[in-house]
Swiss-Prot record:
This is Imidazolonepropionase. It comes from Paraburkholderia xenovorans (strain LB400). It is an enzyme of class 3 (hydrolase). The gene is hutI. HAMAP family: HutI. Its EC number is 3.5.2.7. Signal peptide: none annotated.
């Protein structure tokens, strides 16, 4: 039985910097928080437990990256150069590039290679305090390759000190062998791929890319109904490039989240509020493909829709492996506040996964997953660009990462 009192710390238990404790303590037994609060109120039964002094550092819940595509083969730097030369993302996709080029690389890679490549993308997130991550499939687009991706995602969760939730995104793009036969491909997704992968326990949720270069409302709804037959929650890539009404459809199916949302209108926002659907904003993609249409932040605020922030880490539109950078981008590009972005990577991000009862906040009875920060103010998490701020990551009560400090000595 391992018992520890973490003390001499400043605590932000709910991911809200407006509600903090200046001198706090956390009592952890066998990886679970049994008590937390003001250090002066530490119950006598924990007073003799071994102590871990955090020297006045800030502690937040472990961060949650709730929308990623970390598992894939290759990279798309050449397409990045094309876009710099003036070719649009949609034009590249129609030429057989974009998602489909990553499909080719992912299909060609074996499981061991995919694991190595994906681990290199996961590790920087862990070093920034991320203890929970969602990973989507969607670069296989056939049963064997989608299975391979989801198996690798599960292995990442087994090999690294991070909780991984998997999302089946078979309806991400039309594979080359189904050119001109989108409905037939959706048949394959709904009747072959999803049943097999769900039966194998590889799927925690189901996503669909509902867009003019993706799948229609009718096709998206077929995927949702198939997911519901397996009692799997749904989510949607929606309103990124146009207002197609996907968010309203997602809300009708009580989606956990609708993601991107640059072209979301008020009717869609109202539908999200009614359904309890979280808005996941992805500033990395907005920045990387040079979008100019901002997501409707004021409408989301007015309707009190929870807003999460994520990396959208992927090879084509957001090759990002820094959730802290996304916090900065959300403040500078989307005009979000520091409390909004911190909740966006903790409590609201956990809610976007349907896991707010397990992650995104610190309270008695939950796993002791938290990040320790070398900052004077929590605003620094969104302020600094490229500076390593996470001093320690604790998962289930155990230190799983400690930043090595460079020598400060003069020569």
């Amino acid at each position: 039985m391992k018992q520890t009192v973490w003390h001499h710390l400043k605590l932000c238990p709910q991911g809200d910097p407006q509600h903090t404790l200046a001198d706090a303590a956390i009592a952890v037994e066998n990886g679970t928080i049994v008590w937390l609060g003001a250090a002066c109120a530490l119950p006598v039964e924990y007073a003799a437990w071994p102590r871990e002094d955090l020297h006045g550092a800030w502690v937040t819940p472990g961060l949650v990256d709730c929308h990623t595509h970390l598992v894939y083969g290759g990279q798309r730097a050449d397409e990045f150069a094309q876009r710099l030369a003036g070719v649009s993302y949609e034009e590249i996709a129609r030429q057989g590039g974009g998602i489909v080029s990553t499909v080719r690389a992912t299909r060609a890679a074996d499981e061991a290679s995919l694991l190595r490549q994906s681990a290199a993308r996961l590790e920087p997130l862990l070093a920034e305090g991320v203890t929970t991550v969602e990973i989507k499939s969607g670069y296989g687009l056939d049963l064997a390759s989608e299975r391979k991706m989801l198996r690798v995602a599960r292995q990442l969760g087994e090999r690294y000190p991070v909780t991984v939730y998997t999302t089946f995104l078979g309806a991400h793009a039309l594979p080359p062998e189904f050119t001109g036969r989108a409905d037939a491909y959706i048949d394959e997704v709904c009747n072959t791929m999803l049943p097999a992968l769900a039966d194998e326990g590889l799927v925690d949720a189901v996503d669909v890319f509902c867009e003019r270069i993706g799948f229609s409302l009718e096709q998206s709804e077929r995927v949702f109904k198939a997911a519901e037959r397996y009692q799997l929650p749904v989510k949607m890539h929606a309103e990124q490039l146009s207002n197609g009404g996907g968010t309203a459809l997602a809300a009708r199916h009580h989606a956990l989240s609708a993601d991107h949302l640059e072209f979301l209108d008020e009717a869609g926002v109202a539908a999200m509020k009614e359904a309890g659907t979280v808005a996941v904003l992805l500033p990395g993609a907005y920045y990387f493909i040079r979008e100019t249409q901002l997501p409707p932040l004021e409408l989301l605020r007015r309707y009190q829709v929870p807003i999460a922030i994520s990396t959208d880490s992927n090879p084509g539109t957001s090759p990002a492996t820094s959730l802290l950078l996304m916090m900065n981008m959300a403040t500078t590009l989307f005009r979000m506040t520091v409390p909004e972005v911190l909740q966006g990577v903790t409590s609201h991000a956990a809610r976007a996964l349907g896991k707010a009862d397990r992650h995104g906040s610190l309270e008695a009875g939950r796993a002791a997953d938290f990040a320790v920060w070398s900052v004077d103010s929590l605003a620094e998490l969104a302020y600094w660009i490229g500076r390593p701020l996470c001093a320690r990551v604790v998962r289930a009560g155990e230190t799983v990462y400690t930043r090595r400090e460079l020598s400060q000595g003069l020569r």
